[in-house]
């Protein structure tokens, strides 16, 4: 993909990237005013997907407002990421703050080499949550200057759209539901996973009841049939394989057991990491 096409292509951002940036901002070392790192994702013919990122340690020089990246660390983490996600490529870099920093041009030169033929993208995230909103802006550097003279870079805004797949929407809606609960000042724990399954099943049951009422009204000639709705129902029914009730119950119970096992293992790993973090803090003191 050429660099000019990268500027014109639509850019989609996954919510996971924003969560990773916010988490890195909350865990930033004392004295650091911002965090920055590498954006990863996939490029298609007509759009770009930012699907992942990782932070890169940096050093800020207050006297000249310069920022030095740990490029060796960035290269090593990128190499490890390529083993886990071989389809992801470097798309640019992110930074927290309210405006583009003075060192953006120098950082841009580094990511030009990493992106190859693609134009590096610069995602700016204002993690200060002004007005209780997370501001995200996407920039693309454009060369400017007079012919034969000194040339510079101008960071121009690029349209950005936050997209979510069905699996992402479940987590996003759960977080949104918890954020709207202002009953207590302390953050409440998320509801257990099985309760979420029950809520999702109840929601599906309500939608099926609504669908059955519509079909019965059409058969009883109480409502006029809609061809578009009929084709949508046919596509939905043909997309789902026909299972025997006993076979479906066995498959569902197996998936529930797998989910419980995954929850148990993740809880054990989380507890182990918390203990390791506390032990490391005690050693530092």
Swiss-Prot record:
Main location, first listed in the record: cytoplasm
Keywords for the protein's UniProt record, in alphabetical order: Cytoplasm, Initiation factor, Protein biosynthesis
One Gene Ontology CC term in the entry: eukaryotic translation initiation factor 3 complex, eIF3m
Compartments it resides in: Cytoplasm
Transmembrane portions of the chain: none
Keyword Protein biosynthesis: yes
Family: Belongs to the eIF-3 subunit F family.
Name listed for the protein in its UniProt record: Eukaryotic translation initiation factor 3 subunit F-2
Species in which this protein is naturally found: Drosophila sechellia
Lineage: Eukaryota, Metazoa, Ecdysozoa, Arthropoda, Hexapoda
